[in-house]
Structures are given as C-alpha cells and as structure tokens.
Amino acid sequence: MIENRPWLTIFSHTMLILGIAVILFPLYVAFVAATLDKQAVYAAPMTLIPGTHLLENIHNIWVNGVGTNSAPFWRMLLNSFVMAFSITLGKITVSMLSAFAIVWFRFPLRNLFFWMIFITLMLPVEVRIFPTVEVIANLKMLDSYAGLTLPLMASAIATFLFRQFFMTLPDELVEAARIDGASPMRFFCDIVFPLSKTNLAALFVITFIYGWNQYLWPLLIITDVDLGTTVAGIKGMIATGEGTTEWNSVMAAMLLTLIPPVVIVLVMQRAFVRGLVDSEK
C-alpha cells in the first residue's frame, strides 16, 4: 500500500503549478503585447492588462506583411503549411518504404545500407547543411518548393522507428500473404500499413512540427519574398542597428504562427500518445 503523505501532495502540486506558470507567463506577455499599440508596448513598465488592438495588429501583418519588403503574412502561413505538410508526407513515405525493404526483402548488404542511413544521425547539422545547399544550388532548386522540402524528406530516425516496429510483426503474416498470392506491395498496403497507423500518427505530429518550425533551411534556400516562411519572417521583423522593432506586430505574428501546430497536437493528441506507447511495447 502506498502511504498517503499530505505534505508530499502539497509539494508536488505546488511544483506543478509553478512549472505551468513559468511556461505560460511568457505566452501571456506575448499575447498582451499583441493586443497593444506601439506606444503602449514601449512604455516602461509594459502593462500586463490586454489592450484592444489585437485585430488591428493582425490585420496589419495579414495584409501588409511583416516588414517593408515581405509578402503578406497569410502567404507566409501558406508557405509554411505547404512546407510542413510536404515534409511530413515525404518523410513518412520514404521512411516506411525504406524500412519495409530493409526488413522484408533479402538482398546483399541490406544491414550495411541500414547502418549507413542510421550513422547520419551522428553528423551535426552544421556538417550536413552546407553540402546540401551546394547540391540544391547545382540542381537549380533555389527559391522553389522543391528545394524547400525535398532535402528534408529523408529521416534516419523515422526509418529506424519503422524498422523496429516492422521487426516485431510475426513471420506468419508474411507466410499467409504469400500463400494468398499477395505481392510485396499488396502485403504492405493491406497488412503492414494498417498495423502502423498508431506509429504514423505519432510521427505525423512530430514531423509536422519539425517542418513548421524550420528556420535555418528556408533562410539559406529562399530569397524570393513570396516563398518566405513564418518563422524566418518573424526573425525579419526584428530590427537591427538603429531600426525600431514593432513588438506588437511581432507578437501578433508569433500568435498566428503558434495556431497550426497547436491545432495539430490537440486534434491528434490521443492518437499521438497511443502511437508513442505502442512503439515502446
């Protein structure tokens, strides 16, 4: 029997409340700043009571963009969505098919190919990113959705996770499919894919947020303002030198940028947790 200790319960709940406050307070300050005008934001100290300029600030960046030479913010949101969704579908497709081939097909050096994929995790981003930019430039894919998404569609982690899951599937499934005359792709579509739905949900959430939060890659690949993404666009709103940053517009843009990943997490929360739990079994 677990002994009930009131002081321990009080302490744990106090720490939980403090942790939540530490996380939510910066978000609340950002929300308040997004509701104020420029003068109120620069007042010292800035008020913590929400103002009435939220819709005005959102409309300003939605129509006029986040800077003097930028696309409207709705365009940046669209670009970020296209990038995140394309990367997500690409990662899932490439990772599932490569893991399926490594596990279920018998061909020479298949384990070597897997470890060659897996060893890329040991390479820092700084080592990989500039050669990748050089390849994209040589292929004439700068300032394009293809250059923005294709290099990020390969994932060693996703391939590893799917490989580990596929290795837990019983061999009897393969034998039954062979007896029924199913081709490898029929076996993949009718048996392997449905059994992988929980893992797919978890990977979808993780990969979408990964693609949505990309900052360095779009900054290196994109110079066309009409192809800019939200995260890079917000960075462009912060003035350097003698310029003045309109923090109310920056915070309004940040709030809009938070909405899509938050919606994805809330909608797929149960499937995401189930996918993480099932992948550990």
Swiss-Prot record:
Keywords: Cell inner membrane, Cell membrane, Membrane, Transmembrane, Transmembrane helix, Transport. The keyword Thylakoid does not apply. GO terms for biological process: transmembrane transport. Coiled coil: none annotated. This is sn-glycerol-3-phosphate transport system permease protein UgpE. It is found in: Cell inner membrane. It is a multi-pass membrane protein. Its main location: membrane. Part of the ABC transporter complex UgpBAEC involved in sn-glycerol-3-phosphate (G3P) import. Probably responsible for the translocation of the substrate across the membrane. The keyword Cell inner membrane applies. Residues 77-268 form the ABC transmembrane type-1 domain. One of its GO terms (cellular component) is plasma membrane. Belongs to the binding-protein-dependent transport system permease family. UgpAE subfamily. The chain crosses the membrane at residues 16-36, 85-105, 113-133, 142-162, 202-222, 247-267. The complex is composed of two ATP-binding proteins (UgpC), two transmembrane proteins (UgpA and UgpE) and a solute-binding protein (UgpB). It comes from the Bacteria. The lineage of its organism: Bacteria, Pseudomonadati, Pseudomonadota, Gammaproteobacteria, Enterobacterales. InterPro entries: MetI-like, MetI-like_sf. Pfam families: BPD_transp_1 (PF00528).
